C-alpha cells in the first residue's frame, strides 16, 4: 500500500523522536567552559556579610525541595560536627551545604541532578548566572567548605580514587588538560563497570575526604571541586582515562555577582599560603597543618594565567577588573527582585541604584562648576 505524504512525514518524525529518546549522548571531558566556577577569592567576606544571607532567604523561600534538603542536612550536621576536626573559621552553613550535597549525590536524588545541571550551564554568561541560577547561596557555601577542608597536595594526591561515567569522551591534543566541570564524588574502591562505562582513575590535590559526612569512619569517599585542573592520559590500551592533578584550580569567573565578567581563558587561582588550625570544641589539643601549596608553576599551564588572591573585592558599582581578560558578555543591568523576575535570587536592595549614582555624579559636577 502506498504511503501518503502526511503518513510518511508522521512516521519519520516518530522515528526521529524515538532515536533522540534512546540515544545515549556522550559526555565530553574538557575545560567545562559553561560551568559556573566562581571561587570568590577576592570577595568572599563581602559576599558573605552583605549578599549571601539575603540570597539564602529568597532562594529557600522559592524552593521547597532545597529547603527540605537543607533542613534534613542541618539535623545530620548538628549530630556529627562535634566529632570532626574543623578549621576555626569553618561555619555551620558550610558544613550543612557539604552534608546536603554529599548525601544527595550519593543517593542520586532529584535535587542532586537539578543542582548539577544548573551548575553545568550557569557559566554560559554572567547574565545566565544572575537571572537563571537559583542556587547562588548553596553554591557559595559548598565552595567555601571545600576550600577550608583541603589538605596539602602531598597528602591527598597519594590516594587514588575512581569515578565512572557512561560513554565519556576526551579529545587528545596539545595540552590534554581538563576539569570535571561539576562537584564530583570519587571512591577509593575501583568500581565494577558495564561495557558502556569508562573508569576515571583520579589523583586529586583538592579533593576533600567526606566519608565522615556520610557516617563513615574512613576516607573512602572524596569530593572533588569542579575547578581542579587535571592532566589527562589513557590507561594502557583500554578506553579508561587517568586524571592527574596539576595542583591548581582555574576559573572563568571571579566575583561574578559583584560584576566580574567571564574571561576568555581559565584563570589559575592562587592558593592561600598560610597554616590553618583544625579545631574541635571537645578537644584541647590543636593540630597545626601547613597548606602545602607554595609552588604553583604557571609554566606548566601555558593557557592558564594566575590570579592573585587578595581580600580587596570589587564594589558593586565598580567596573570589573579587565586584567582577568576580555569579557565575552556585557554586564547586565540591575538584578531585578523576585517579584519581577522569579529566577533572580537577589533583590534590588543588594545592588546600588544607577539613578542614585547618577544624581550623586551630577551633584558633584555642579558643585565643582560653582567652585
Swiss-Prot record:
Family assignment from sequence similarity: Belongs to the Arg-specific ADP-ribosyltransferase family.
Signal peptide residue numbers: 1-26
Propeptide regions on this chain: 346-371
Keywords: Cell membrane, Disulfide bond, Glycoprotein, Glycosyltransferase, GPI-anchor, Lipoprotein, Membrane, NAD, NADP, Nucleotidyltransferase, Signal, Transferase
Pfam families: ART
UniProt-annotated stretches for the region Disordered: 306-346
Disulfide bonds: 43-255
Highest taxon in the source lineage: Eukaryota
TR mART core domain residues: 64-250
Reaction(s) the record says it catalyses: L-arginyl-[protein] + NAD(+) = N(omega)-(ADP-D-ribosyl)-L-arginyl-[protein] + nicotinamide + H(+)
A GO CC annotation given for this chain: plasma membrane
Entry-linked InterPro entries: ADP-ribosyltransferase_ARG, ART
Membrane protein topology class: Lipid-anchor; GPI-anchor
Cellular localisation: Cell membrane
Protein name: Ecto-ADP-ribosyltransferase 3
Lipidation, GPI-anchor amidated serine type: 345
Residues noted as binding NAD(+) in the record, renumbered to the chain: 101, 182
Enzyme class: transferase
Residues annotated as transmembrane: none
E.C. designation(s): 2.4.2.31
Record GO terms (molecular function): NAD+-protein-arginine ADP-ribosyltransferase activity; nucleotidyltransferase activity
Amino acid at each position: 500500500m502506498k504511503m501518503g505524504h502526511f503518513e510518511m512525514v508522521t512516521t519519520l518524525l516518530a522515528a526521529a523522536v524515538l532515536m533522540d529518546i534512546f540515544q545515549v549522548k556522550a559526555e565530553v571531558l574538557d575545560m567545562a567552559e559553561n560551568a559556573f566556577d566562581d571561587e570568590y577569592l577576592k570577595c568572599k567576606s563581602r559576599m558573605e556579610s552583605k549578599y549571601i544571607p539575603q540570597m539564602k532567604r529568597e532562594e529557600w523561600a522559592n524552593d521547597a525541595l532545597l529547603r527540605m534538603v537543607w533542613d534534613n542536612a542541618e539535623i545530620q550536621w548538628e549530630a556529627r560536627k562535634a566529632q570532626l576536626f574543623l578549621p576555626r573559621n569553618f561555619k555551620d552553613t558550610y558544613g550543612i551545604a557539604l552534608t546536603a550535597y554529599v548525601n544527595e549525590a550519593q543517593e542520586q536524588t532529584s535535587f542532586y541532578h537539578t543542582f548539577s545541571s544548573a551548575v553545568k550551564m550557569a557559566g554560559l554568561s554572567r547574565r545566565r548566572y544572575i537571572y537563571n541560577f537559583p542556587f547562588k547561596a548553596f553554591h557559595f557555601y559548598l565552595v567555601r567548605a571545600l576550600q577550608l577542608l583541603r589538605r596539602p597536595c602531598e597528602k591527598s594526591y597519594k590516594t587514588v580514587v575512581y569515578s565512572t561515567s557512561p560513554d565519556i569522551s576526551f579529545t587528545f591534543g596539545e595540552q590534554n588538560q581538563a576539569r570535571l566541570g561539576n562537584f564530583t564524588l570519587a571512591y577509593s574502591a575501583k568500581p565494577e563497570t558495564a561495557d558502556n562505562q569508562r573508569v576515571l582513575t583520579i589523583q586529586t590535590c583538592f579533593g576533600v575526604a567526606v566519608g565522615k559526612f556520610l557516617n563513615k569512619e574512613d576516607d573512602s569517599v572524596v569530593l572533588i571541586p569542579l575547578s581542579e585542573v587535571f592532566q589527562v592520559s589513557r590507561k594502557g590500551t583500554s578506553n579508561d582515562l587517568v586524571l592527574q592533578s596539576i595542583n591548581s584550580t582555574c576559573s572563568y569567573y571571579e566575583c561574578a555577582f559583584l560584576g566580574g565578567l567571564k574571561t576568555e581563558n581559565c584563570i589559575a587561582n592562587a592558593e592561600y599560603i598560610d597554616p590553618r588550625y583544625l579545631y574541635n570544641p571537645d578537644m584541647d589539643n590543636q593540630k597545626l597543618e601547613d597548606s602545602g601549596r607554595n609552588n604553583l608553576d604557571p609554566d606548566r599551564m601555558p593557557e592558564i594565567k594566575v590570579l592573585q588572591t587578595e581580600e580587596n573585592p570589587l564594589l558593586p558599582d565598580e567596573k570589573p577588573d579587565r586584567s582577568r581578560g576580555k569579557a565575552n558578555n556585557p554586564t547586565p543591568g540591575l538584578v531585578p527582585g523576585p517579584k519581577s523576575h522569579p529566577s533572580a535570587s537577589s533583590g534590588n536592595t543588594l545592588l546600588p541604584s544607577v539613578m542614585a549614582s547618577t544624581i550623586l555624579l551630577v551633584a558633584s559636577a555642579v558643585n565643582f562648576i560653582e567652585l
